[in-house]
Regions:
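Helix-start/capping segments and mature chain N-termini
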Residues: 1-66, 90-254
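Short, acidic/charged, Gly/Pro-enriched secondary-structure junctions
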Residues: 60-88
């Protein structure tokens, strides 16, 4: 079904309250990349908010594959969403949850951004229940809009204690004296993030805003973008302002 023809109730809690969880995946050569890891996180998010997924894992996989084939997609961006459904104004348990699968062609940022790096800004805001992937995205939206206003590509969220947590749509990494580090707490643990931590033995730790000038390299990670170098933060160079050697190595390996 075409997206513009799909409808939901105006009383759906996902629409009214952002009372929903979701997961974004991608395909590589027609196969769903890191499917098990994504579904595990989807199940975890649903459990936290008290939602029961109406399909088994294999059924979801088959539905995704069928949708990809029907749309003749090889490189696709997939999103699955589960809301509490139409419960009128009652905040009680879900009676008729809404489950949705979307698939569309995956488009990557220009190659130049991977070669020269992107710019980021910092934005002081905190995302509640950061450990789950919920459709209540207002903090991330505000952060990204601020980045756009400043003509940057991404925003790094900073909490009230001056800690860098994550990007508006990504996880963040830094390199300091040859060691890869990444924020440990108050984040959504990305699937690509886990791969990077395993490959680089990255240290999960507290990263303070005041420590940004000390960083030699920076990059972000996400399912749809992969690894993307960050060469400027708040208008200032990261290291020498070029994509660093460790980031380059990761780009060639993932």
């Amino acid at each position: 079904m075409e997206g513009k023809k799909a409808v939901i109730s105006v009383t759906d809690h996902g629409f009214l309250y952002g009372d929903a969880v979701y997961e974004t995946m991608r395909t590589v050569d027609g196969k769903v990349w890191l499917f098990d890891e994504h579904i595990k996180r989807f199940e975890s998010s649903a459990k936290v908010v008290g939602l029961k997924i109406p399909y088994k894992k294999i059924e979801i996989y088959d539905q995704i594959v069928s949708l990809i084939k029907k749309n003749r997609l090889t490189e696709a961006r997939i999103r699955i969403t589960l809301s509490r459904g139409s419960n009128e104004l009652d905040f009680g348990p879900a009676k008729n949850p809404t489950f949705l699968i979307e698939a569309k062609k995956l488009t990557f940022p220009p190659k130049e951004l991977y070669e020269k790096g992107i710019s980021a800004v910092t934005f002081e805001i905190e995302r509640p229940m950061a450990q789950i992937k919920t459709t209540s995205m207002l903090p991330s939206i505000l952060a990204y809009q601020y980045a756009t206003k400043k003509k940057a590509h991404e925003a790094f969220l900073v909490d009230h204690r001056g800690r860098i947590t994550e990007g508006s749509m990504s996880n963040v990494f830094f390199v300091r004296r040859g060691k890869v580090i990444t924020p440990k707490k108050y984040i959504l643990e990305g699937t690509v993030r886990k791969l990077i931590i395993k490959q680089t033995r990255a240290k999960q730790t507290t990263v303070k805003y005041r420590d940004l000038p000390k960083m030699d390299e920076a990059f972000i990670s996400s399912t749809t973008k992969g690894i993307m170098p960050v060469t400027r933060i708040n208008g200032k160079k990261v290291g020498d302002g070029k994509v660093g050697p460790i980031t380059k190595k990761l780009l060639s390996n993932l």
